[in-house]
């Protein structure tokens, strides 16, 4: 049997900005197997489109999938089945609390951060988990729907997001930043309760000199960018987090 000589040889597929059919993704998985990959991260939600069937979203009045292009949950189960046969781990990726413009456009305006950070270019794509308990509850419900679905399908890891929820993380007060970290820890706990290992992108977590929080050390960190005041790899390692670079 031939296999990768590294622990995590992964392929990230953005199937949210651009829609890919079930058959196309299955064909890619087969090719990845021949190239000794051992995992594929399927990123199915972006500002440009939410591409996986959702009971939570379909309950919103007027909600529509962009161009009616999306994978059904049955499609995803078939993708996971083929991936298992080819020894490719499927890692779902649902970015939050930002990159959710395709969802927020169907929700009340105060569900987004537009009123809190009016000068920030990404405000309308970020859920207001600071002052709107209904918005926070909705987002937790959405994350829980897919944590439940993918854990029941046998997936072991889940990327809960964490990147680019605002253009300037320095806009946060210390109290607001603590709320962000509490959100990540809460979603992490939900994933762990279902036997999944949570992961996030690095740029929005442990940022700058904010204090008063402790990031869950069980969260895997996908270290993809290092803008000013971002936590270093060393800082994550000291916190106990596994870093993927």
Regions inferred by a protein language model and the residue ranges of each:
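Feature activates predominantly on carbohydrate-active enzymes
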Residues: 1-159, 163, 190
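Active-site neighborhood of glycoside hydrolase catalytic domains
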Residues: 123-220, 224-241
């Amino acid at each position: 049997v031939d296999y990768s000589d590294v622990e995590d040889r992964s392929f990230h597929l953005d199937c949210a900005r651009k829609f890919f059919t079930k058959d196309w993704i299955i064909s890619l998985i087969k090719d990845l197997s021949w190239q000794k990959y051992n995992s594929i991260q399927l990123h199915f939600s972006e500002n440009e489109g939410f591409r996986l069937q959702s009971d939570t979203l379909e309950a919103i009045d007027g909600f529509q999938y962009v161009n009616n292009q999306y994978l059904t949950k049955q499609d995803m189960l078939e993708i996971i089945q083929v991936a298992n046969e080819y020894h490719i781990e499927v890692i779902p990726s649902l970015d939050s609390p930002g990159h959710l413009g395709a969802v927020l456009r169907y929700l009340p305006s105060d569900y987004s951060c537009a009123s809190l950070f009016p000068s920030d270019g990404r405000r309308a794509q970020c859920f207001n988990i600071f002052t709107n308990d209904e918005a926070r509850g909705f987002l937790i419900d959405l994350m829980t729907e897919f944590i439940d679905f993918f854990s029941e399908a046998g997936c072991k890891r889940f990327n809960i997001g964490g990147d680019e929820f605002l253009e300037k993380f320095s806009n946060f007060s210390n109290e607001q930043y603590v709320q962000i970290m509490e959100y990540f820890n809460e979603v992490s706990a939900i994933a762990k309760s279902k036997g999944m290992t949570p992961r996030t992108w690095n740029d929005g977590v442990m940022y700058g000199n904010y204090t008063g929080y402790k990031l869950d050390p069980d969260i895997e960190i996908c270290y993809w960018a290092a803008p000013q005041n971002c936590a270093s790899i060393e800082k994550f390692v000291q916190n106990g987090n596994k870093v993927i670079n």
